Amino acid sequence: MIKLSNYTLAIFILINIFNITFGSEKFFNKGLEFYKDKKYDEAKFMFERNIVFNPKDSISYLYLAKIYNIEEDQKKEEKNLETTLLIEPNNEEAILMLMKIALEKSNYTKVKDLSNKFTKVCKKLCNENKDILESLSNIEPKNES
């Protein structure tokens, strides 16, 4: 049996940590590449591998949600968006995507709640909120009492 010195063991551990850290980044970048090339099954596999090494990577969950949106699997899309928001509560793209799902489901209360949250955090996609609220006002039942 080989005895390792503490120094050798420490180097071995650091190398493995280094490989895991940069390996997961490699999985994400490869997934992004596949996503841009519209190779969604391969992209999904890479994002899932990235999550194994980095379970708190909200962007991988967001891209999985985008893939499930394309595949029209709303249940998995919504699950990944919720996970994205658990990790990164101010992710405006995830909030916006959830608003669109809630609008499709005619869940007006959820759309309004998400819209309020969205207006507090939006930086890039602020105009999208206005469009959704306009759609909501066109669909929402009028009170004719």
PLM regions: where:
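Structural marker of alpha-solenoid helical repeat scaffolds
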Residues: 53, 87, 120-124
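Terminal, low-structured helical/coil segments at or just beyond the last alpha-helical repeat
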Residues: 112-145
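Register position in tetratricopeptide repeats
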Residues: 36-37, 70-71, 104, 135-142
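Canonical positions in the second alpha-helix
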Residues: 49-50, 83-84, 117-118
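Canonical tetratricopeptide repeat
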Residues: 63, 97, 131-135
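Residue-level recognition of tetratricopeptide repeat
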Residues: 57, 91, 125-126
